[in-house]
């Protein structure tokens, strides 16, 4: 085996160089003593051409799970610092690549493929737009498609990212809500999309869930997802195609309402009015406004004549100092 031997004071600079030319061997560990660091490399000829000292040395293998922890292990620092978030939906990787580093997309694609070898499509993330919150995506590597099956919390979720909204980062939140639910509850999920919340809830609990969604493509996929998971579910799901603001007034009240509210939509009054025991209401709030948001929820409870206990938790980052939050509302009377 081969490695490059460098003085400790030069180690950081050389590590970045090895990453940038793509010859750092991530399957083996570097070793160090008081004066030197030896980095594992995959190509000694390139290392020599860079003027580095190549040595024969036995370097330990990393455990499989530690080969690559994240993109920072694989990309030069200047590229990684400018790269946006990376999400995996099924076998599709979605990454934010600013224009200023778009010329490095082959390096970025190579790193993603090493980190996620099962990925078959890599797409560049654009902006959300339109009534259905569809994100603009450009396939930059792999199969020319944006449909896949995503696995989460013991369920399978069909998505077509060119036609529907789906956020894989809510996996933990969907599980949290499912664990709060009790068997026998009647639950309403407006803005249900391809029904990830209803699926996860019904996966774990024997409940009846009503899912309301306006996007006809999402409704079609939701129906396919219901069939796909039929044998996995303890509960039942009823899918309703329509506008939340038109459908909900005609529905009865529910034990619990889970509202993954789209950004810019105010459905607090409506969703609270349909909840008899619990409401989980999502919104996007600046960190300085979180307590004010909680007070707004309490004020709406008072306006509707409900005594409520309200706690607000940060769910995920949206942009600097702005968070997706969830108001967990317990209706006491």
From Swiss-Prot:
Changing residue 260 to N: Lack of tRNA(Phe):m1G methyltransferase activity, but does not affect tRNA(Phe):imG2 methyltransferase activity. It is found in: Cytoplasm. Changing residue 213 to A: Lack of activity. Its main location: cytoplasm. It catalyses: guanosine(37) in tRNA + S-adenosyl-L-methionine = N(1)-methylguanosine(37) in tRNA + S-adenosyl-L-homocysteine + H(+); 4-demethylwyosine(37) in tRNA(Phe) + S-adenosyl-L-methionine = isowyosine(37) in tRNA(Phe) + S-adenosyl-L-homocysteine + H(+). S-adenosyl-L-methionine binds at residues 174, 191, 213-214, 243-244. Coiled coil: none annotated. Its EC number is 2.1.1.-, 2.1.1.228. InterPro entries: MeTrfase_TRM5/TYW2, SAM-dependent_MTases_sf, TRM5-TYW2-like_MTfase, TRM5/TYW2-like_N, Trm5a/b_N. PROSITE patterns: SAM_MT_TRM5_TYW2 (PS51684). One of its GO terms (cellular component) is cytoplasm. Belongs to the class I-like SAM-binding methyltransferase superfamily. TRM5/TYW2 family. Less efficient than Trm5b and appears to be selective for methylating tRNA(Phe). This is tRNA (guanine(37)-N(1))/4-demethylwyosine(37)-methyltransferase Taw22. It comes from Pyrococcus abyssi (strain GE5 / Orsay). The gene is taw22.
């Amino acid at each position: 085996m081969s490695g490059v031997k460098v003085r400790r004071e030069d180690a950081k600079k050389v590590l970045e160089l090895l990453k940038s030319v793509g010859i750092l061997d991530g399957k083996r560990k570097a070793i160090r003593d008081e004066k030197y660091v030896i980095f594992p490399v995959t190509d000694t000829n390139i290392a020599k051409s860079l003027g580095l000292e190549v040595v024969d040395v036995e370097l330990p293998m990393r455990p499989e799970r530690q080969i690559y922890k994240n993109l920072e292990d694989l990309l030069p620092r200047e590229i990684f610092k400018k790269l946006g978030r990376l999400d995996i939906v099924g076998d599709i990787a979605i990454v934010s690549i600013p224009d200023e580093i778009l010329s490095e997309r082959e390096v970025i694609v190579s790193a993603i493929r090493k980190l996620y070898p099962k990925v078959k499509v890599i797409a560049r993330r654009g902006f959300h737009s339109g009534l259905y919150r569809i994100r603009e995506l450009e396939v930059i590597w792999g199969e020319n498609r944006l449909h896949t099956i995503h696995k989460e919390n013991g369920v399978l979720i069909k998505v077509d990212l060119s036609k529907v909204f789906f956020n894989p980062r809510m996996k933990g939140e969907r599980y949290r809500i499912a664990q709060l639910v009790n068997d026998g509850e009647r639950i309403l999920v407006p803005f249900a999309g391809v029904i990830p919340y209803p699926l996860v809830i019904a996966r774990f609990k024997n409940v009846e869930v009503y899912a309301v969604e306006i996007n006809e493509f999402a409704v079609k996929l939701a129906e396919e997802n219901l069939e796909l998971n039929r044998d996995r579910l303890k509960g039942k799901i009823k899918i309703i195609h329509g506008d939340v603001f038109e459908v909900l007034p005609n529905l009865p009240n529910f034990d619990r309402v889970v509202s993954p509210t789209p950004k810019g939509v105010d459905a607090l009054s409506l969703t609270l009015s349909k909840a008899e025991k619990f409401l989980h209401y999502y919104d996007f709030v600046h960190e300085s406004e979180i307590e004010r948001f909680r007070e707004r929820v309490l004020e709406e409870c008072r306006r509707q004549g409900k005594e409520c206990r309200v706690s607000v938790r940060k769910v995920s980052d949206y942009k600097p100092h702005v968070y997706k939050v969830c108001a967990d509302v317990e209706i006491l009377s």
